[in-house]
Amino acid sequence: IPMTNGHFKPLPEHKFSFGLWTVGNRGSDPFGAPVRPHLSPGQIVQLLGEVGAWGVNLHDNDLVPIDATPADRDNIVREFRQACLDNGLVVPMVTTNLFSDPAFKDGAFTANDPAVRAFALQKAMGAMDIGVELGAAILVIWGGREGTETDGCRRADVAIQRLREAVNFLCEYS
């Protein structure tokens, strides 16, 4: 393990990768306001490049605001891809934020409302498209809002069936 002045020095072959949501976290919580300044995705990539990180991961909306126009989305992704190239970083993984929007209060892929399930699929496909453009080989499906109240709002077998259908659909899309 390479050491510099007694400290670990990360090398690209160690493949340290960080999420935009972790490095860019402003330090707010339910009990207080943000305590750190906002960092743009480009600033985060530059910082990660400076410390020797190998990669950067992201949720769709960590990079592209949910209300971005298609042209804005394309510009943002293009500029981010260039920032990664300029700083020697790869994007190994993307995921989709299926938890922040109030639409997902009842789940995303397992929601009772078919319009919410369709919205979740559209967001996931958009995240997959971003991932392809950035060279990511992995899409993470994190079900943070799936099933937390399954017993109270739907049968577990129905939730599992809906999740299976969503994953199968996304596999076909890929």
Residue ranges of predicted features:
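N-terminal pre-domain/capping segments
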Residues: 1-137, 157, 161-172
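Short, conserved phosphate-binding/catalytic loop or strand-edge motifs used
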Residues: 141-147
